Amino acid sequence: MKEVKRYSGVIVKCGDEVLLCKRNATGSLPGQWSIPGGSLEKDEHPMDGIEREFKEETNYTLDNDLKLVGFVKRYNRDGSEMKGLMYVFLMETDKRINPDLENAFDGDEHTECGYFDVENLPFDDKDDQLCRLITRILKKD
């Protein structure tokens, strides 16, 4: 059995919307919308990983309390083996964070970012684990 790759991601919730970023066409998950985040380094704590990844991707330092709200499992194409596990954190804020993709270290991983409410989440698969988790969080209020 292969080692499962670990990731961290953050749902940035502002009012009744969440921040999502669209992946570029050449990286992993090309053209898909997702939460900011990425791969953890060896022995890196998930909280440290999301703080690092968020800064690298958005040029913004997370300064609010983060809360672990769930996990998203990723499987190989036939669904027989888990290949990745994402620790998903939630950060609630009253002020929109506007990612600075142009000046971010890894800003080229995304082509755009935006805020979406529960009715307009840009996921092709509404049954995707991440989409369901975001929907549950947005409908809590």
Show which residues each predicted segment covers.
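Conserved N-terminal beta-strand and adjoining loop/helix that marks the start
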Residues: 1-19, 36-39, 85
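A generic fold-level signal
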Residues: 3-5, 13, 27-28, 81-84, ...
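Conserved hydrophobic "DFG−1" position in protein kinase catalytic cores
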Residues: 12-13, 20, 91, 115
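Short, flexible active-site-adjacent loop segments at beta-strand->alpha-helix junctions, enriched
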Residues: 16, 24-25, 72, 95
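Conserved Nudix-box catalytic region and its N-terminal flanking loop in Nudix hydrolases
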Residues: 17-56
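Unchanged
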Residues: 40-64, 73-129
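Charged phosphate-binding loop/patch that engages nucleotide di/tri-phosphates or the phosphate backbone
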Residues: 126-141
